[in-house]
Amino acid sequence: MTIRTHNFFLPTLLIFQMLFIFAMSSFGHTSSDAQSNLFVDFIAQNFPHVRHGLENNLISLSTLIFLVRKTAHFTEYAILGSLFFLNLRNWLKSNSTLTENSKLQTTKTLTRKTPNTQLTKAVAKKSLLNPIKYPLIMSISLSFLYACTDEIHQIFVPGRSAQFRDILIDTLGASFGATITYLIIKLFAKIETRSDK
């Protein structure tokens, strides 16, 4: 897949996922319950152990619905975190030449204006202020911010409310998705490096 295709395809997937989360949060309490019940029925029909637990009161229906909803939250944001990471990484790669030129110019400027004893600290500080160097951290941070706006959105949806617990679950899901994506890419990069030797 070419860089130009990546520049269109990945952002489109990211926007679609953000809109999907927004749409799911726009459902009222009744619609949300109906969706959860569909998943619960599917699980009960296809997993005998779960059905046995419900029939023998080993697990309550409300607990199962709660687990289904929170798993959905986790999964939605795992996908979002992964897409944020891929988009940030792609942006970084496509702008690598510009970034290197900028760093070179910054170093030259600091060399002229900053004593040698302070040059290393100044360059290090400049690097820390460049968040795109850290797509993993930024993808988790952006997912957290989106989770916050999602909970604020739910305040205005009938029957829904904002819960800090959901923000934590969403952020945990985003962290999982972004980290797994990062590790997979790193693993394939190592395999490719070894095969070239």
PLM features per residue range, with description:
Residues 76-92, 172-188:
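Membrane-interfacial alpha-helical segments at the cytosolic side of multi-pass membrane proteins
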Residues 92-133, 192-197:
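Membrane-interfacial, low-structure loops and terminal tails that flank and connect transmembrane helices
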Residues 1-7, 126-131:
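Short, Lys/Arg-rich N-terminal segment immediately upstream of the first membrane anchor
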Residues 5-13, 134-138, 142, 165, ...:
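Alpha-helical transmembrane segments of integral membrane proteins
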Residues 2-86:
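"…centered on the first transmembrane helix and the immediately adjacent amphipathic helix/loop
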Residues 87-96, 153-157, 161, 184, ...:
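Membrane-interfacial segments
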Residues 148-171:
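Interfacial helix-loop-helix junctions of multi-pass membrane proteins
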